[in-house]
Every structure is written in C-alpha cells, then in structure tokens.
C-alpha cells in the first residue's frame, strides 16, 4: 500500500495511537518525497518534555527537517487555534520552497481543524490569558465557574465546576470578544488543507502489539532522561493544571522523586495510563475519522 502513493496530492496526514509507529512512517515518507515532517501532537509542542512525549531526537530525525516540535515553553498555554495558525504559516512557506508536508501526530482535533472541521477560535491577548490563569490559581476553579454561570450560563452548564482549564478558556473568549465560546464552536472553520487533496492514514497496530510497545517504551524512557525532564519541569513551579504538567508520567515520576512511589510502580502505572490513553485515541479515530482515512497495520 505504501508503495503506491499518489504523487499528485498536496500533503500526507498520518495519525494513530501513541506508540503505533506513525513517526517512523512519517520520516520514511518525508525522505522519499524530499519533505518536511510537521508535528500534530499537542504534547510534543512543549520544549521541556522530549523524552516523556516521545518527541523525535535529533538522531531519530535522521537529517529530515521536523517542524512544530518543542517550540512552546512548558508554562505556556497552546490551543488548537494557535497550532492552526502556526501550521498555516508554515505550509505557506513550504509551498514557496517546493517542500512536501508530511503531518503526523496523535491529536485528532488538530487534523479536524486542519481540514476545516473546527471553528477558528479568536486570538486571546497574553495579558488577559495570564490574568485569568492567575485568578484560577488564587481563587480556584469553582469561583470562576460561578462567574461563568452568571455571564454565560449555557456554556457554564456544559462544564464541571472543577474543570479550570476549560472554564478559563470560556472566560477568555468572553472577555476578548464579548461573545460566548459556543458561538465560535458552532461555526465551521477555514480549510487549511483540502481533505480531498491529502492522503490520509491511520496507523493501527494489533492491540497486543501496541500494548507491548507501550510497556517497553516507558521503561526505556526511564533510562533515557525522563526523570531529569520531570525534575526540570517541576523546577519551573508551573500551575498544576498547566498542560505540560498533565503529560503521562509527570505525576508518577514526581511521586517517585518525593519517595511516594518506586521506579517499578512508576513504570507500571505510567504504562497503564498510556494504554488507556491509546484506547481513547482509537475510539476517537473510529468515531471521528471516516472511510477516507486509510487504516494501515504496521
């Protein structure tokens, strides 16, 4: 199947669950097309967490250009809309250079946005975003949720009072635009890549194979700098709800560093959490990505 790629398409899109082998496939196809590998994984954008997010190392990139990897400071929020703006500018540059984009990652929402399935969310001023995040730390999610109830009750009804990140996002949009975030969510977004002009693949290993890869990979991460990454992340004193702090393995390794968990338990619990995450990804792909996405088994 991989030998018969149509040379007339504008891009290749590759997704799949974590540890499925999609990054290796993207690398091979980019090399064949004199292309550039572009990240579509919401955790691999962060600069501090290369090992824990399985971001390709310089050695693994094998000289093929990789973009939108590790370009966001760990303490920064980074939305789907921001990724969409970043990749839009990058794709324009690559077209001018005659380079072929191979876009790969496990964040299905990014691919929906890329092909026009999501609304174009408004840009949020940094001072507004930082102010609301400071309020979240000082006042707590429940108080901000109560504010949202009074200002945007229909949106507040859709959120749990403890979901600080989404509550702050709703308030950000409300403050910046005077409109409910639901107004933007109901609108269809721009089409950055025409889905009819892209070859689209979902890499789906058999479940026992995937689980074995996950188990072995996390053990290897522990030997390859994951502990040092978490130490560096904790030294930043980020808010507990910062996206980078939610990467699988961070909480477990943090517990190990304070003596609450041993290394073997860290590996076991982190691998189990990764398997659950892969299961959620596969459910999302099954429900959200149609038959125009070719399923392949590595």
From Swiss-Prot:
UniProt binding sites for ATP: 16-23
Enzyme Commission code(s) on record: 2.5.1.75
Cofactor(s) the record lists: Mg(2+)
Region (Interaction with substrate tRNA): 41-44, 165-169
Enzyme class at the top of the EC tree: transferase
Any GO molecular function: ATP binding
Residues the record lists as binding substrate: 18-23
Catalytic activity: adenosine(37) in tRNA + dimethylallyl diphosphate = N(6)-dimethylallyladenosine(37) in tRNA + diphosphate
Oligomer and partners: Monomer.
InterPro entries noted in UniProt: Dimethylallyltransferase, IPT, P-loop_NTPase
Signal peptide from the UniProt entry: none
Biological function: Catalyzes the transfer of a dimethylallyl group onto the adenine at position 37 in tRNAs that read codons beginning with uridine, leading to the formation of N6-(dimethylallyl)adenosine (i(6)A).
Family recorded in the similarity comment: Belongs to the IPP transferase family.
Keyword match ATP-binding: yes
Keyword GTP-binding: no
Source organism per UniProt: Agrobacterium fabrum (strain C58 / ATCC 33970)
Keywords linked to the UniProt accession: ATP-binding, Magnesium, Nucleotide-binding, Transferase, tRNA processing, Virulence
Gene Ontology BP annotations: tRNA modification
Site (Interaction with substrate tRNA): 107, 129
Protein name: tRNA dimethylallyltransferase
